[in-house]
Structures are given as C-alpha cells and as structure tokens.
Amino acid sequence: MKIKSVVSVLVMMMLLMSCGPGQKKSADGNKNSESIKFETETQNKDNAVPGAVLSVAMVKDSPLVGIFNEAMYKDGYDGDVIEWFLTNVILDIDENFEITDTGIATLNVDPENKKATIKIKDGMKWSDGQPIVADDVIYPYEVIGNKDYTGVRYSDESAKIVGMEEYKAGKASTISGIKKVDDKTVEISFKEIGQGIFTGGNGLLTYAMPKHYLKDVPIKDLEKSEKVRTKLVVAGPYTISSIVPGESIELKANPNYFRGKPKTEKVTVQVVNSQTITAAMKSGKYDLVFDIPTELYKIYKDFDNIETLGRQELYYSYLGFKMGKYDKAKGENIVNPNAKMADLKLRQALAYGLDINQMVKAFYDGLREKATSSVPPVFGKYYPKDLAGFPYDPEKAKKLLDEAGYKDVNGDGYREDKNGKPFEIKIAAMSGGDIAEPLVQFYIQQWKEIGIKGVLATGRLIEFNSFYDKVEADDPEIDVYFAAWGVGTNLSPFETAGRKSMFNYTRFASEENDKLMAEVASPKTLTDPNYKPEAYKKWQEYFINQAVEVPLTYRYQLYPVNKRVKNFDVAYGSQKKGKGIHLVELTAAEPIKSKK
C-alpha cells in the first residue's frame, strides 16, 4: 500500500471512530478485535524429490550483521539464523517453555541445596565430530562473565551463580560455583534459586560452546572472530559452507546432528528487501520466508503457491522513554532525575494519547492486537489479563499534562515546558517497509492533538542497525523511541528491565522495581505454583504504571511457505515431539510459482 493511501485510510478511520466529550472512549480503548488464526505445520503429503535445495529468504532492509553464536549475537535476525540452523542449544523446551529431557543434555534441580546438574547424553557431537563435553557447557559462563566480554548476555540473573560476580570483577580466575563433576556432568551452585530455572532463567544458560575450537580466541576478540561469523562449529542441524557477508549464507547438513542428519542436504539463506519479497514469493523464488513484515500479508495471502503458517509471537512492540544512561564502569543503569522524560505524568500522558487499537486496525489487517503488558498472551498463566495498561484517553492525557505544568503559553497549539520554554520530543523510529513513515507520523499527529510537539531524531527514520546502536549508546538526540522485544522463553524481567542489564534501554531503575523483580525469581516459586504468576502480576502493575516502557502491540509471527515444502513445523516445543528443520523435505525440484 502506498504511503499516501495509508494516511488517507487512517484519517478516515479517525473521523469515524472519534468520540465526543463525555463519551467513554477509554472503556472501549482496550477492546481488541479478533486476530486471524493459522496452522503451525505444513499440510503437504506428497513424496519428496532428491537433491532439491531449500531456499530461505530473510526479509531485512539492511545487511545481516552475521554473528552466529548464542553468547555473542545482538541482532534478532542473527538470532533467527541461529535458532533454525546453527544452534548450540543443549536443553530442549516444551510448549510451556519448560526444559525437558529430550535435548542433548538433561537438567536436574536440587532446590534445597540451590544446585542444578546438567548431564550430557552419550554420543553427542559437534559438527566437526568432536564430542560435546562438560568443558563446553562451562565455557559460555566463562565467556559472558569475563571482564573482556563484549556481548550483552551478562545480567542481574548471571550474578545469582556463586562466584560469578568475583569472576566478572577479575578477582577470581574461575567461577567457584561451577564444578566439572566428570566429562559429561556439570554442577552449578546458586546464591538463590527460583522457578525461572526451569525455563532457562536464574542465570542458567541452555547452550554450550565448543571450547576446543574457541579457546584460542581472546574473549575481547571473539565477536570479531571468523569462528563465530563464517567458520563455525555447531551442535545444530546445519553448518556454514560459504557466506557473502551481510547478503547470503549457504548451509550444508550436519552429519553429526543428534536427531539425525537433515533430510535436505543444502540450504541457502538470502537477505531480501521488504519492497521486493512479495514479487519474489509469487514467482516461486523462495521456499521459506522469515521475518516478513505483517503488513505484507494482504499482498501475498491469495498466492496459490503459498501456505502461511503462524504462531503467536514471543514479542511486543513498545514505546520507550530515555531516563538516564548506562554506566559501564559501574555496570548498571543510572537514572537522571533531570532527564526530559523524567516526569511520570508526562510519560503517562503520552501513553494515554495514543489510540493503538485504531492504529492496529488501519495498519495490520488483524495480525496484531493492543498490548497491555510486557508479557505476551502466549504465556497463559503469567499473562495479566486484567491489567488495563493505557487505554486511549486524550482528555486524561491533557489533564495530566496540565497537572505536570506543560501548558500552551503562546497559543500555537503546542505546550511549552514547566518553565514556559519551547518543548519538543525527539523521536527515534526505524526505517523499513511501506508503513514505517506513516506509522510514526500517526504517533506524531496523535501527540499533536494533546499539545505535544514530536519531531524525528536525526530528522528522518533510522536504519535498523544504526537505530539500536544509538539507543544502546544513549544518544542525547533521543528522548523517546519505538522498538520491540523478542521475549525469551524464560520470561525473566531482568534482561530488559534489570538495574544491571545493558538491554534495559530506558535506563530506568528503582528500589521498588528491584524488589518486585526479585520476587519473580524468589525461591518460593519452587514450592508454590501460584507464586510466580502473582509476583509477575504485581511487578507488571508497578512497572507498566511507571510508563517507562509502554507496551503497544502483540503480533502473530508469520511464515509464508512454498507448497513444495513438507514437514515444516513452527509450533513452540515441537522439538519435544522430534520435529524440526532437519525433517523438512521438498516435493518438487524447484519452488512452485503462483498462478494468481
């Protein structure tokens, strides 16, 4: 859809849906329209043909960063390549995101003694044929805890392991709480242990790293090394045979994969621009399409060569407010009480001033819904369904701004700051796709209606990689930003809201936040099955009310699949049932073309 027509539709909807004074718009402002339902597994039952190549498109409007290691990657697109093809995960999860015994290793937890034991099964090998051993299980902890580590996986949770803080500070050469029992067994001691350990939290890492291959690379140089970029040793179903940096990857089947050598010998992964992907799908160029923007669904949904699979994504988009900076020396987030966005009523007003349900209907064709919590609904027992969030209420927004002292002094339609000086908010938003520009203009227009002037930081939309570089670096040109989180199956708040987490991009921290998050990981969660859901609800009630990270939307993750593909399954926990990319077969020599 063209930008002009998107804006026209949106303006028309605003006229049709707006409410007069005194009407209870906020009562309906949280009511979500029904979303579309999708199958999670291909229906193709035809016989496979030998020698066909699986062609995968990754929709991205900028080059692939290309760091393919769980401890080192930062970009979600790299994470997708790892998850599907190059994984080093050794602990499987089920449909409830809880660790099972179906993976490379098993987990046994001793709550009373605050210990966990990881045991590698017999016959497990890396792609180079070397056995997966206890040292490989220990090495990721040594990497992320090292003082020279350049990644972002170290968090408040990591410090729960006995001796990790001393190791991180350089006061110890080993992590005292991690013990190699034998070549296949590792015992980890924790200062405290909570229910999150069963979903890969509490400082537990669910992946290994091939120490025999990586140990000679200084940890400070690991992120730049070809051993995590182009020449990998992995535990997953495929390995890299060749790569064009940023553009494409050629993969070959790993004969040592523990579930069996993949049925399709060769895979190609190509980065494809969002402007050209639907035409390529129609012409039968790709078999699987990852990370396709949801707004393109209306274009390809009727292609007769495509079957669209989908699942509710572990994802929420959000509005973030910059509250301070990350102090690298202290390793924690420092709130600036004088930050432009420091006033709670200002932040809440901006949240109440956005009609997200209206935006979802105009832009996303039933593939998203308004979010009220940082917990997506797919986490059934943890999702706080009664949490109201910020239903659209422009009158309440205006009242909050008045109370906070932001008033229009000169009658130009925009409010000045508390001192009567011109006030504007610099907004960071990502480029990519047809709706990126009209979407941010929608936000700017909505804030204009409550008297707040919003302008684009840098004067334009920001390319994906540069956007996160600026947000992570606390660029002073950014006051607010629109971003999204892929939520880990651990469902731990520490990674994105913790005092010590680099991923806490808002830089918000408070003693109350620390206390409530600690309860989410309390040892009580091990004995009381209702404790964690209740603790999560209490934390969410506080955190959402602070309006530092305002959830905007949940979405479906869509996987357009060419109809020659067989045995592709996207359901969560499908590996517990023995399913996975290694079983995918192709029933035609080339991808099928659409006749429509």
Question: Where does each model-flagged region fall?
Answer:
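Aromatic- and charge-enriched surface segment that lines or borders ligand/interaction sites
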Residues: 105-153, 280, 339-341
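Gly/Pro-rich hinge or "lid" segments in bacterial periplasmic/extracellular proteins
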Residues: 202-261, 266, 276, 283, ...
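Append "and occasionally in soluble cytosolic enzymes with long acidic Gly/Pro-rich linkers
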Residues: 338-445, 592-595
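Detector for C-terminal structural segments
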Residues: 255, 351-383, 435, 439-444, ...
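Ligand/substrate-recognition segments at binding pockets and active sites
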Residues: 245, 407-484, 557
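N-terminal lobe/hinge region of extracytoplasmic solute-binding protein
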Residues: 54-111, 233
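Extracellular/periplasmic solute-recognition and catalytic clefts
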Residues: 58, 150-160, 241-255, 262, ...
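Surface-exposed binding/hinge segments that line
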Residues: 154-216
